[in-house]
């Protein structure tokens, strides 16, 4: 029988007091929401992005809500910027214990129409950058002999593609899902939990921009709607909190029934 003193009944808590969380792509959309949610749960938050004025606005929003945050400029296509951003995060709040790899860019083009500059930007931002950051984050946790959590934002497009554009986006999200599974195996003995959320179509600055270019398909979804970012809060908190201690290498699909099974 499990000792109830070790595990409360029920063993569920979203309290992140004492944790330090870094959220990439926090200047808009889902990342902005994720940063605010983690701060509201008690974590000290580092929001990263390339737009300083947006970062300042995020920090102000979190402060108004009673949280603590700093904004750090980080370019996910630049290794030096990634490593330097993590250095700045640690200088502000200490060792980062929670990483949310959220930053990403769409392509919204058919593959044969993409120039190599766009291909490189999408690959670097959506896949190479998150891998570099995940590895750098894990190195620091391992050196400090501390456990940690990484939550990668994948997509239902990792496993399905309708051929109407955004092929490379689909490829990068498939890479994020596989990265999640592989790194979870590699770092399990180090007590670093690596999981992913695979959202369907949720309202965000990026998604709304894609809808403008590709057309609004929400009426054709089973529930005739796009999701609200707030509907991802509970999944994010579960994967960032002690409630998911035994969960690693898992990709949780949150799609409002939008994808086939």
Predicted region positions:
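Conserved glycine-rich cofactor-binding loop
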Residues: 20, 27-28
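Substrate-binding pocket helix/loop in short-chain dehydrogenase/reductase
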Residues: 110-111, 115-123, 217
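Alpha-helical segment proximal to the catalytic Tyr-Lys
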Residues: 139, 185-189, 245
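Active-site helix of classical SDR
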Residues: 134, 172, 180
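Short C-terminal tail/terminal secondary-structure segment
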Residues: 2-17, 237, 248-261
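C-terminal substrate-recognition "lid" of short-chain dehydrogenase/reductases
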Residues: 93-94, 131, 225-254, 259
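Active-site loop of short-chain dehydrogenase/reductase
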Residues: 19, 67-68, 95-96, 141-156, ...
């Amino acid at each position: 029988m499990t000792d109830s003193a070790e595990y409360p009944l029920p063993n569920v808590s979203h309290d992140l007091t004492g944790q330090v969380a870094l959220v990439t792509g926090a200047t808009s959309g889902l990342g902005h929401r994720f940063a605010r949610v983690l701060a509201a749960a008690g974590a000290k938050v580092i929001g990263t992005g390339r737009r300083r004025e947006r970062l300042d606005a995020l920090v102000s929003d979190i402060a108004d809500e009673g949280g603590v945050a700093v904004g750090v400029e980080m370019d996910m296509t630049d290794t030096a910027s990634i490593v330097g951003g993590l250095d700045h995060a640690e200088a502000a709040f200490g060792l980062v214990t929670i990483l949310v790899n959220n930053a990403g860019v769409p392509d919204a083009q058919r593959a044969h129409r993409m120039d190599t500059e766009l291909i490189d930007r999408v690959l670097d931002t959506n896949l190479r950058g998150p891998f570099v950051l995940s590895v750098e984050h894990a190195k620091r946790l391992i050196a400090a002999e501390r456990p940690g959590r990484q939550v990668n934002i994948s997509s239902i497009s990792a496993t399905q593609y309708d051929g109407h554009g955004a092929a490379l986006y689909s490829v990068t999200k498939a890479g994020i899902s596989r990265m999640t599974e592989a790194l979870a195996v590699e770092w399990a003995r180090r007590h670093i939990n690596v999981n992913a959320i695979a959202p369907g179509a949720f309202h965000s600055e990026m998604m709304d921009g894609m809808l403008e270019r590709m057309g609004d398909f929400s009426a054709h979804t089973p529930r005739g709607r796009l999701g609200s970012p707030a509907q991802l809060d509970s999944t994010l908190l579960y994967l960032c909190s002690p409630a998911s201690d035994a969960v690693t290498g898992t990709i949780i699909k949150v799609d409002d029934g939008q994808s086939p099974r």
